[in-house]
Amino acid sequence: MRHYYSVAAIRDAEASLLASLPDGVLMKRAAYGLASVIIRELAVRTGGVTGRRVCAVVGSGDNGGDALWAATFLRRRGAAADAVLLNPDRVHRKALVAFRKAGGRIVENVSAATDLVIDGVVGISGSGPLRPAAAAVFATVSASGVPVVAVDLPSGIDVVTGVINGPAVHAALTVTFGGLKPVHALADCGDVTLVDIGLDLPDSDILGLQAADVAAYWPVPGVHDDKYTQGVTGVLAGSSTYPGAAVLCTGAAVAATSGMVRYAGSAYTQVLAHWPEVIASATPTAAGRVQSWVVGPGLGIDATATAALWFALETDLPVLVDADGLTMLAAHPDLVINRNAPTVLTPHASEFARLAGTPPGDDRVGACRKLADSFGATVLLKGNVTVIADPGGPVYLNPAGQSWAATAGSGDVLSGMIGALLAAGLPAAEAAAAAAFVHARAAALSAADPGPGDVPTSASRMVSHIRTALAAL
């Protein structure tokens, strides 16, 4: 499990540790870790360290000090080391003295012969885009294709929201210290490496599942399980206009777990043609017993659709509401607010705005938390980084790392997967987070099949790769 910490939590832990250490020890510890990561990166990219050239772009404060000390350690290992000082009057003095003593050079610009650039402009206390001088330096670096290693986070990216509102560093690798921050999931920070500097941090309430966590959560049939005890997923989706939504949603539920899927709606003929193992009927009341309901994908907003939404939400079962279900729910939020059973809402940005009255904005984590608390429901906000908020509980971040899931019908697939996990008994937030993780993996695998390169994919192909994604956990 990944834990993401606020800047305040990191600063509090640093203050406690700094009080117990001699002056400068913590900075050197961080810089040594940074230099060690850079040594490995240089070895991979260039075959070694000796004779290679690094350049630290140095801002004021401790972030610049980390970069200078790291460049000093690299110089001592045989690399040529340069430094561009963006604010010479406010540079970390002790680090600069050590850098010069080791033979480092102060330069005006990054040399064309540079093998790697260290971004030490601003750290986790900074905000806003790069200032003109730094922006000019990194524009040249970007044009030259020299890889950048960022210290703590790529400068110019908002540390809280991950939003970029102007010039920013594009890093191949980010090295951070003590604990991950939400920005490392919310923004493109390249590969992220965490260096342990001895901070004593509690568990956080912003989390990220890893493959081992998902494997532990995902239901596996026990020796004495049958199709009923594994969970029966009910699906209320599709219409004469969008029968494919029903096919995709039920297919994803079939692929996600080994229990049973029941479908109720007008697309039952198409569903059975694709998935003969599904038990299909024309109406919810005829569907039979289930352990969860998925309602909304392709359902429409007519009287029949409204009745289906009412039917599901008036049960005492876990319910996932998506797509057209969210549109109807926006007009009748009391249907969810008064529920005692688990409810999962899975909006994209426009659907979120209808539910909340305003778009999620830059602070997607804060907005998702607020909506979850106001509705008393687990909210999954779709995007390249999926945000899942539990009312009064943790937030899960799932960075996809690619956008292959951004295709028509992809949300229908995700809904079916979450519904299957709810039927199997997983808590709502864990079901949503685990399904989002596997959903992103299935999208990537479907784009890579048959190879050798990635190609456009589709929601139908994603369904067929759910099991492959699960097997790879």
Curated annotation (Swiss-Prot):
Question: How does the cofactor attach, per the note?
Answer: Binds 1 potassium ion per subunit.
Q: Where is this region: NAD(P)H-hydrate epimerase?
A: 1-203
Q: Region ADP-dependent (S)-NAD(P)H-hydrate dehydratase: list its residue ranges.
A: 210-473
InterPro entries found in the cross-reference section: Carbohydrate_kinase_pred_CS, CARKD, Nnr, Ribokinase-like, YjeF_N_dom, YjeF_N_dom_sf
Q: Where is the YjeF N-terminal domain?
A: 10-205
UniProt-annotated binding residues for K(+): 63, 119, 155
Tell me the Pfam families matching this sequence.
Carb_kinase, YjeF_N
Q: What is its EC number?
A: 4.2.1.136, 5.1.99.6
PANTHER family with a match to the protein in the record: ATP-DEPENDENT (S)-NAD(P)H-HYDRATE DEHYDRATASE, ATP-DEPENDENT (S)-NAD(P)H-HYDRATE DEHYDRATASE FAMILY MEMBER
Q: What does this protein do?
A: Bifunctional enzyme that catalyzes the epimerization of the S- and R-forms of NAD(P)HX and the dehydration of the S-form of NAD(P)HX at the expense of ADP, which is converted to AMP. This allows the repair of both epimers of NAD(P)HX, a damaged form of NAD(P)H that is a result of enzymatic or heat-dependent hydration.
Question: What's the protein called, per UniProt?
Answer: Bifunctional NAD(P)H-hydrate repair enzyme Nnr
Q: Which species?
A: Mycobacterium leprae (strain TN)
* Gene that encodes the chain: nnr
